Amino acid sequence: MQSTFPRGRQAVIGLAGLLAGALVCQAALAAPKGSPEHIAAVTARIDEQAIRANASRTADWPAYGLDYAETRHSKLTGIDAGNVNQLGLAWTYNLESSRGVEATPLVVDGIMYVTASWSVVHAVDVRTGKRLWSYDPKVPREYAQKGCCDVVNRGVALYKGKVFVGTFDGRLVALDAATGKTVWEKDTVEDRSRPYTVTGAPRVIKGKVIIGNGGAEYGVRGYLTAYDAETGEQKWRWYTVPGDPAKPFENEAMAKAAKTWDPAGQWWVAGGGGTVWNSMTYDPELNLMYVGTGNGSPWNHRKRSPKGGDNLYLASVVALNPDTGEYVWHYQETPGDNWDYTSVQDMILTDLNIAGKKRKVILHAPKNGFFFVIDRTNGQFISAKPFTEVNWATGYDKKGRPIETPQARSREAFDSVPGPFGGHNWHAMSFNPKTGLAYFPVQNVPVNLAEDKDWRFNANTPGQPQSGTGWNLGMQINSQPPKSKAFGR
């Protein structure tokens, strides 16, 4: 219906509306710190523009890795080498959990959002340590048996007044940032007969909440799903590995990937793996999002693909179009993964001068023990250097292929270095552009691996290694003690 007001009056009414909105916003910002009105106002402003603007001053921590590049590098200078020894305890807050806590807190204008085990979300006033609200998704406790590595959660996403959390039992929940009340909830698990879990933090890119999953040890097929941040409507889904080749593939990327698997292994029965349970980054200028994919299901390469093959897109960095979820490029860090060498560890986007040329790169330190520099415009391999003891490969050739050692794929017992815990795991990584240094914790826990010749998917055979846990590895773990010198350090 057309307006009957004269144009001049329409303009006056429109201007009045804008002024009224501005006054309401100012009043909300002037509300007492930590009040629902204050929280609603400051969190409503968190969007793509705010996250990018904050990266230049880092007054807040509005996104999982601080910024879209996930540098985790604060530009604040209030704490330095000269006064760090003066820091002391101001307050404590009880997360009410005796289980693992792996979350990165988000902080906006003094309001902290942090998760604990069982996907419980806490909103805390950092000025006082006072609880503002908490949200418990009531994950059934028996669901714990479907997770490999505790009922942890790595954090939330924040966008336009909402807090988004993935729950251990596979739901994605949108909460009102001011009250903790549920706005919408979606089940992200496409097949409830499979033991999918969610432990990673969602990311919000261009109004879409993107979440992956875990469960490769138990036999699942990995995928990412994007949901509309406002309504929860599913926008796209991208699988990391191909499904049953007897059925049509979802896209050309899956058809291409299937050629790198051997159907004799019936990988689709055991899921294939490749779950995205952690790292996602985004380059607004290139309009590309980057994801790291997980290990194979089962672990044993011979079991899932007897004739070999790279098994795309396991243990890879993959670039996707965030608008559509379409595949753009990939670089596989561990072709034919045989050791649980996931590539889901944190990745950082930065620009480096290499051979006299400025290049847009990804910095990545995955489980396999090599530190990678990859061109993020096209996936071209630049370099890979070991950052810890490594015995499965001596290095990478100029084409970006690992130079494997003969014993790495032996059928006999073999000390895997790094072991399945990885040289670097879920622990945060950061980059200081001033020093040009990347910082991340390194570990080395060698594990003895041997082929489980009697393995069958979900056999649950009494006395068979790992069978009672529901794990589908095709491997025996520490059937004999590791002898590597790194063991026990």
Task: Please provide the spans of the model-predicted regions.
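Blade/loop signatures of beta-propeller domains
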Residues: 32-89, 245-255, 401-402, 480, ...
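Repeat-blade elements of multi-bladed beta-propeller folds
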Residues: 61-65, 100-120, 145-171, 195-218, ...
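N-terminal cofactor/phosphate-binding cores enriched in small/glycine residues
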Residues: 70-189
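Extracytoplasmic beta-rich repeat domains
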Residues: 93-104, 134-157, 185-201, 239-279, ...
